[in-house]
Every structure is written in structure tokens, then in C-alpha cells.
Amino acid sequence: MSKIFVDACFRKETPYTPVWMMRQAGRYLPEYMEVRAKAGNFLNLCHNPELAAEVTIQPLDIVGVDAAILFSDILVVPNEMGMKLDFLKGEGPVFDKPIKTEADLDALIGGEEAANKLTYVYETIKILKQRLPQDKALIGFTGAPWTLATYMIEGQGTKTYNLCKKMMYSNPEFLHKILRRVTDVVKFYMEKQIEAGVDVVQIFDSWAAAIEPSKYDEFSWKYMVEIAEYLKEKYPHIPVIMFPKGIAAFIERGLVYGNFDVFGVDWGTPMALAKEKLGEKYVLQGNMEPCRLYSKEATTMCVEGIQNIMGGNGHIFNLGHGILPDVPVENAIHFVKECQRVSKKA
């Protein structure tokens, strides 16, 4: 059976523009909070295939999105490379021993050996393939090497990225060694997600905006493209989505390149600019400002505006970043219904 989301990724004719939301399996859903409480904490939920599959499916049933995205976290990758991960209340993700020296990097597990440790992710995918409706796509994902490296070097989330940037400008060879090690693990990780059954993969570069545009290709984009092209060569039938957040200047300068299918547009990049620079080569995904979900009127206005720019094929509706925890569920449902309404073909 044809999956509308996969068809849209390949610019095929669809009855309407499909829609999903980043972080759609999340804290805005009371049903998600119930399952998370059952798991005990966020990491336990990621490590429990049965419960992770349950929360992955919830947004399809409750909100009506056209695709499911695997419930997991980007930081399971460095965790299985040997960096102990904790989620501390009020602080978010924290690694107990950030990378400071060559010895720290050498101590980590690399390549396929690290990817093989993520069995709970592949098990979740296998459960989902049994339970998802045949017309609904399952999206697998990873963090981009740069975004993963920021946590691995800083030890936690950061507003300044000073340790990463100090390394970027004073010891770029070492930063490239870290990025190479992470890239090699991610390639195997994505391959194993595809082998387990995902229909689409997305690479999230959440902290792309931390890099100045003239350095973005060198320290992030080229590694993302390497992963995408490795996957496209082996699995041409699997769409690859790139989502680098906050790189409007990079887009405007015409610097985006690579063999992938869909470009995720963040809410800070005008959709008209993305269409002008990228729309002929790539399907575009996005890009409503997530805070518009607090108002149904603001949501409808934005959805209609995006539809007016994007028209028919070559587009997937989404937010320009993740849905926030205090958004009313009825407003998320309204967003999905409006996307499907305005794009429905006669």
C-alpha cells in the first residue's frame, strides 16, 4: 500500500500535503505523560521498546498526523559510544566525562560496534512495523555529527558553545577527529534503522546556527551530506530529510548541496526564500513557528500562507521546530486538520 508521506518525499502526486510535527510524541499529550510515568524517567522510556512504540503511535491516533517518528533521543548515540548520559531535572542532558583530550576520544567505542549496542532502538522499530497502519510511514532519525559533538564536548546543552568553538578555531584537527568518529557510528546506526524497517530518515542539526556560515560546510554540512549520500547509494528507495536549524544565510548564499530528498525549513527561514533557492532540487518540509500553536487563528493564517507559497507537490507540512509541552492538544489537532484542508486536491 502506498504511503502518502513517502510519496510526498519523492514529489509524487498526493491527495493532500501530508503533515507531521517534530516532537509530536511528547509532553503536550497527557497519554504520553502517563506512559513516561510508567517508565520511571525519559531514558527508561527510550530503552523500553514496548513503551517507546506505544508513545510513537499516540500522535497518529490522537492528533491525526500522516507519519510516525520513532520515539528516541539523539544522545543515545554518544551514550552507547561509552559516554554516560543522565537527564537531570532543570538541567537536561548531562555527560559525566566530556571529551577534552585525544585519550578521551580514543576511549570511546566506534563504528558498527557502537551502532550494534542500540538494539532497543531497532527492537522498537520492529514492533512499530507490526502495529502501524500500512499507509502510515515510520521516520527514523539521528542527530547530525556537529550537534552530537556539541554535547560530547560541552558535557551538556549550552548557549555559548565556547568549548566547541575554542576547539574549532584553535584545534580544528581534533574537532574533525571527533566529527569523523561520530559520523562513522551514525552511518551504521541509520543503516541499521533502515534494515529494521523505517521508511524515511531525518538528520537533525539542531545547533547548526552555532557555526558561522563560512564554516558551516566544513564542520557540519559535509558530514551530514556524507551520511545522506552513503544511505542514498545503499537504499535509494528510502527518502532522506535534512533539517539544519538556523542556517538562512547559508541557504541564501546558495551553499546547500548533496544527494538527499527533503530539506527541512526552520521557522526563521522564509519559505519563499527556501523555495527560490532549493525548491527545484528538493522537496521542502515546514515551517510554521511552533508558538503559533497557542492560537488557532494564528495557526490557520500561517498554514494558508505556507500553502499559498508552496502550492501542490514538493512540500510536506511541519513546524519549524518541535511542538512545545504546554500547547493544547486541540490546537495541535487543529493544525493537522488545517494543513490537510487547505492542501486537499479536488
Curated annotation (Swiss-Prot):
Gene3D superfamilies: 3.20.20.210
GO annotation (BP), single: protoporphyrinogen IX biosynthetic process from glutamate
A single cellular component GO annotation: cytosol
UniProt pathway: Porphyrin-containing compound metabolism; protoporphyrin-IX biosynthesis; coproporphyrinogen-III from 5-aminolevulinate: step 4/4
Xref: PROSITE patterns: UROD_1, UROD_2
Family recorded in the similarity comment: Belongs to the uroporphyrinogen decarboxylase family.
Name this polypeptide is given: Uroporphyrinogen decarboxylase
GN (gene name): hemE
